[in-house]
Amino acid sequence: MPDVKESVPPKYPGDSEGRSCKPETSGPPQEDKSGSEDPPPFLSVTGLTETVNEVSKLSNKIGMNCDYYMEEKVLPPSSLEGKVKETVHNAFWDHLKEQLSATPPDFSCALELLKEIKEILLSLLLPRQNRLRIEIEEALDMDLLKQEAEHGALKVLYLSKYVLNMMALLCAPVRDEAVQKLENITDPVWLLRGIFQVLGRMKMDMVNYTIQSLQPHLQEHSIQYERAKFQELLNKQPSLLNHTTKWLTQAAGDLTMSPPTCPDTSDSSSVAGPSPNEAANNPEPLSPTMVLCQGFLNLLLWDLENEEFPETLLMDRTRLQELKSQLHQLTVMASVLLVASSFSGSVLFGSPQFVDKLKRITKSLLEDFHSRPEEAILTVSEQVSQEIHQSLKNMGLVALSSDNTASLMGQLQNIAKKENCVCSVIDQRIHLFLKCCLVLGVQRSLLDLPGGLTLIEAELAELGQKFVNLTHHNQQVFGPYYTEILKTLISPAQALETKVESV
């Protein structure tokens, strides 16, 4: 199964990474139809997770991300699998060279390759391209080619050049350069090898073009499919929504105790929420949408291995864990940048190049922060102070004194401590930003970033968009269930609305 990369693909046929010399057929994961026919009387969380996995993960990913596209997995050359694959492919192409160099030449492998090339070219055609279909069928008529091979008259190089011309007609603009490079190859074996490499990419381009074209239909299908599968489970076990109900009950309680606020874009000073007295005297009316937003935000603070994890989010548990890890990394990175900027000010941090370099260094050194926080942050403090010292020196400015350097390193190392005030403030502000993303959207939220977050704006935009995509898709799938639960949690006097609106 090809790996999935979430990014914006180009227009037809979309861009993708290279693949092996001989294309392999891959498709969406098959639904697991195993399991007993009679449902068990009780379904544990583990059992539920296994059952929910029956839902197509591919459908879920496509439905959640409108920029979804697929690419083949590129094996590291140093890996065992990569070495084995390269060895097998080299052996095949060496064998083909021996066959074509024999006297008389043996065209058996060449015929198989031409047959596969023909099938790939035909698969790249759109339904309306009948003229090209007929032309390919005639030019690569396998019966005729077999007769030529039997008489030793098969023109492999000539046929390869024809294939190249057809590829130039069918490929996306992003593949033009690769096809043009093949035109300079005169060795038939190397030419066929290159043809297969580029055709493999063109096949993936067509897959991504098809996904992009069908995106609206796939999204709607994904929503209906996931909801239907969940309803099947709910019919087997009526208590399936117990943990979801507890989760939303807690979110409603959090809002009742401390109503959430989100800065309005028209007032950049409204970063902080109302005071406790204002909140008590002027409680904001609850709405199902705000309760749900609070619930999603709470998940970023949860232990995601919690046995009472909401049933409606089990499919998203892994993605939530990734978002939580990314959020924590951004919290530490922003804290490092904020502390470092206080020692050099706008002199260095006014340079985007310097900030980007410092972010790259910090990010790479924080990879082990979760398992070895003190050691990781010590390395970060040494590298950051060294970069600041050297950059000031290169600009002809006064470098940090030994006292300032020691103070900088000390404050950076304190970031690894629990309840560090800088980290706590940054963490609260990132959560506030994510709340605003759910309410206002990512782009509007970026217009009014709280202090300390401007240096990680690009990273925040990526995090916010992933979070919005996840919550939006989940809400579209399970909205009817949430609406029914929230009716029991929000009294008519409290409610602003009676139905969950899309976040």
UniProtKB/Swiss-Prot annotation:
Q: How does it sit in the membrane?
A: Single-pass membrane protein
Q: What's the chief localization of this chain?
A: membrane
On tissue specificity, the annotation reads: Isoform 2 and isoform 3 are expressed in sperm. Isoform 1 is not detected in sperm (at protein level). Testis-specific. Isoform 1, isoform 2 and isoform 3 are expressed in sperm.
Q: Which modifications occur after translation, per UniProt?
A: Constitutively phosphorylated on serine, threonine and tyrosine residues within the head and tail regions of noncapacitated spermatozoa. Phosphorylation on tyrosine residues increases upon sperm capacitation within the acrosomal region in a protein kinase A (PKA)-dependent signaling pathway.
The places in or outside the cell where this protein is found are: Membrane; Cell projection, Cilium, Flagellum; Cytoplasmic vesicle, Secretory vesicle, Acrosome
- Enumerate the Gene Ontology biological process terms: adenylate cyclase-activating G protein-coupled receptor signaling pathway; germ cell development; protein kinase A signaling; regulation of sperm capacitation; spermatogenesis
Per UniProt, the ranges with Basic and acidic residues bias are: 1-22
Domain of life, per the record? Eukaryota
Segments carrying the region annotation (Disordered) are: 1-42, 254-285
Question: Mind telling me which InterPro entries this protein's record contains?
Answer: Tcp11
Task: Name the GO cellular-component terms.
Answer: acrosomal vesicle; membrane; sperm flagellum; sperm midpiece
UniProt subunit comment: Found in a complex at least composed of MROH2B, PRKACA isoform 2 and TCP11. Interacts with MROH2B. Interacts with PRKACA isoform 2. Isoform 2 and isoform 3 interact with ODF1 (via leucine zipper motif).
Q: Which family does it belong to?
A: Belongs to the TCP11 family.
Q: Which PANTHER family match?
A: T-COMPLEX PROTEIN 11 HOMOLOG (PTHR12832:SF14), TESTIS-SPECIFIC PROTEIN PBS13 T-COMPLEX 11 (PTHR12832)
What role does it play? Answer: Plays a role in the process of sperm capacitation and acrosome reactions. Probable receptor for the putative fertilization-promoting peptide (FPP) at the sperm membrane that may modulate the activity of the adenylyl cyclase cAMP pathway.
Protein name (database record) = T-complex protein 11 homolog
Underlying gene: TCP11
